Regions:
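Glycine/proline-enriched, intrinsically flexible loops and inter-domain linkers
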Residues: 1-182
Length: 182
């Protein structure tokens, strides 16, 4: 759950007050589980656009990085405390018409400092059939980025947007229009 993923940052924040040189900084904490669905009717989608579209519903586990550790950089694209890493692009593309146009480390997203936090990632995803699809977002760290400690800067805040330029909400079901990318 999101609470279970975020709780360690609260505990570490308390411990940092007593042992600042022995506690890691905040990390992304929450999982960015990309839930995509297509080929079925959704509010705000013209059923005509769905003719011939493959019906699918997939979930890919994704995450940013952990906070800087005492004496070390944080781990890139690794969640703490679960240790979940990312689902391989090939699995998502095999199970559905989803196409990953980009999946790469997000430069400088870990927060500068003597030891930086682990890097997050940039992903660009589309429906390969050029049909609309839905993203069910449950993404944290968009408004409040992971805070740096010991003089380190905060990490980069998350962002959810369409290639066409529209910004999406971090929570809730939203339409990715036909031909666009998230």
């Amino acid at each position: 759950s999101t609470i279970g993923q975020m709780l360690p940052d609260i505990v570490f924040g308390c411990l940092h007050q007593a042992r600042p040189d022995q506690v890691p900084a905040e990390g992304t904490s929450s999982l960015w589980n990309v839930r995509l669905a297509g080929g079925q009717t959704f509010k705000g989608v013209d059923p005509e656009q769905l003719k011939g579209a493959t019906r699918f519903n997939v979930v890919g586990f994704n995450t940013g990085g952990t906070g800087a550790r005492p004496g070390k950089d944080g781990l890139s694209v690794t969640s703490f405390p679960s240790g979940i890493r990312n689902v391989a692009v090939e699995i998502m593309e095999t199970l559905s018409p989803v196409v990953y146009w980009k999946k790469e480390y997000r430069p400088d997203s870990g927060g500068a400092g003597e030891h930086r936090g682990g890097l997050g990632q940039i992903m660009e995803i589309a429906n390969g059939e050029s049909a609309p699809m839905i993203i069910s977002a449950t993404f944290d760290r968009i408004v409040h980025a992971a805070r740096g400690t010991g003089g380190g800067l905060s990490g980069g805040a998350g962002r959810l947007s369409l290639k066409s330029g529209a910004t999406l909400r971090g929570f809730g079901r939203q339409v990715i229009p036909a031909g666009d990318r998230v």
